[in-house]
Amino acid sequence: MSLGGGGQQQLQQLSQEIQAIEEEVEELEADVASLRQEQTEIEEAKEALDVLETGATVQVPLGGDAYVRAEVKDMDEVVVSLGGGYAAEQDSDAAASVLDEKKATIDGRIDDVQAEIADLSEEAEQLEQQAQQAQQQMMQQQMQAQQQPQDGEQ
C-alpha cells in the first residue's frame, strides 16, 4: 500500500519539521535544567551568607570532587562574581543583593525559555495535526482509487 508521491513528500517534510522542533525543545529543556542548577547554587550561596560566621570551618572545593577544610577569616567582606570574569569584594548585604539580582535574572530567563518551549510545543502539535489530516486524505484517495476499478467490474 503506497501513498501518493506528493503526499508522501508533504508527510516527510512535516515529520522533519516536527523532529527539528522536538530537538530544539530538548535543547531548551536542558537549558532550563542548567538555569535551575544556577538558581540552586545562588540559593545555597545566600543561605551560606546568612549562616556562616567568622571562625566557622567550611569545605572549599578544589575541583575533581576534592575538598579542603578552611576557616572563615572574615565574613564582613565577601567576594562576589559580577560576570564577565570580574569579581568585587562587598559586604554581606551587598553580596546578598547581587545574588538576588542574579536569581531574578535567571528567573526571567527560565520564564522566557519555558514560554518558548510552550510556543514550540504548540507549533509541533499543529504540525502533527496537519500530518494526520494529510495522511487521512491520502488514505481516502487511495481507497477511492482501489474501489473505482471494482465498481466498473460490476
Swiss-Prot record:
Record's GO cellular component terms: cytoplasm; prefoldin complex
GO biological process: protein folding
InterPro entries in alphabetical order: PFD_alpha_archaea (IPR011599), Prefoldin (IPR009053), Prefoldin_subunit_alpha (IPR004127)
Pfam families documented for this protein: Prefoldin (PF02996)
Amino acid composition bias (Low complexity), ranges on this chain: 127-154
Keywords recorded for this protein, A-Z: Chaperone, Cytoplasm
UniProt region (Disordered), positions on chain: 123-154
GO molecular function, one term: unfolded protein binding
Claim: Metal-binding is one of the keywords in the record: no
CDD domains linked: Prefoldin_alpha
Keyword Lyase attributed: no
Compartments (UniProt record): Cytoplasm
Family to which the UniProt record says this protein belongs: Belongs to the prefoldin subunit alpha family.
The protein's assembly and partners: Heterohexamer of two alpha and four beta subunits.
Function: Molecular chaperone capable of stabilizing a range of proteins. Seems to fulfill an ATP-independent, HSP70-like function in archaeal de novo protein folding.
Protein name: Prefoldin subunit alpha
Organism: Halobacterium salinarum (strain ATCC 700922 / JCM 11081 / NRC-1) (Halobacterium halobium)
Encoding gene, per UniProt annotation: pfdA
